[in-house]
Amino acid sequence: MKNYLFEVCTNSVESCIAAQEGGANRVELCAGIPEGGTTPSYGEIAMAREVLTTTRLHVIIRPRGGDFLYSPIEIKTMLKDIEMARRLGADGGGFGCLTANGEIDVPVMEQLMEASEGLSVTFHRAFDVCRDASKALEQIINLGCDRILTSGQQATAELGIPLLKELRERAKGRITLLAGCGVNEKNICRIAKETGIQEFHFSARESIKSGMAYKNEAVSMGGTVHISEYERNVTTVKRVKDTIGNLTSVI
């Protein structure tokens, strides 16, 4: 039997609870999901740690959306966020930094890795926009990261199957490949079979309606970027169970 591991990308404490109940081994807690995930708040991390009794807690360390080229003040912010996550009991973190030329920013990563000593580290999807995946793989291994979260440099992990397979073969067990982006109950079996990857990152979210009786839908909190204030996406126990079950049931 293969030792599959399932990480759920959670956007709230509510989603963390659902992930744990659904059987996730680990969560990656994020704020700012529409931006690709940003560092969650102190309170969110603290409450997630409180409710996650059987599921490991990882926290994304990303001070903003956009690219992965960080200023000195942003790097200092990331260092402080790593320390915050550690103090609150996180088991690990996810971060990634690039140079302006799309290379892994090794000196900055070394600072973050030193600050993360004793924590499990995922080099997140900054990898998917780097210039040279093969070179980056070796650099990330040398940095001592535990895993790389990647879609195979494509819009979804399913489209990235060829590179995911190649990366796993190149890694030769020196680092874990965590397949993520668009992984769901319908495609997880194909991704596992065709890549040989054993760790999967997915959100298992559904949209739920707001409980507000009064709604002023003429106003958007996002200004010109319209995201409805009257519905939100949360991880559901059923979708977590279905995604895990569809793979483990065919072992």
Model-found features: residue ranges?
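Hydrophobic faces of well-ordered beta-strands that scaffold small-molecule active sites
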Residues: 4-10, 27-29, 57-61, 93-95, ...
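Active-site-proximal loop/turn and secondary-structure-junction residues that shape catalytic pockets
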Residues: 12-14, 31-33, 61-65, 97-99, ...
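Active-site beta->alpha loop and helix N-cap motifs at the rims of alpha/beta catalytic domains
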Residues: 13, 45-51, 55-106
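Catalytic cores of alpha/beta
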Residues: 11-21, 69-81, 128-143, 167, ...
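Glycine-rich phosphate-binding active-site loops on the catalytic face of alpha/beta enzymes
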Residues: 26-38, 84, 88-100, 145-158, ...
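Glycine-enriched alpha-helix->loop->beta-strand junction motifs that scaffold or abut catalytic
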Residues: 20-27, 52-54, 89-92, 115-119, ...
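Alpha-helix-loop-beta-strand connector modules within alpha/beta enzyme cores
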Residues: 37-65, 104-126, 161-185, 227-250
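Hydrophobic, well-structured mid-protein blocks that either form specific transmembrane helices
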Residues: 90-146
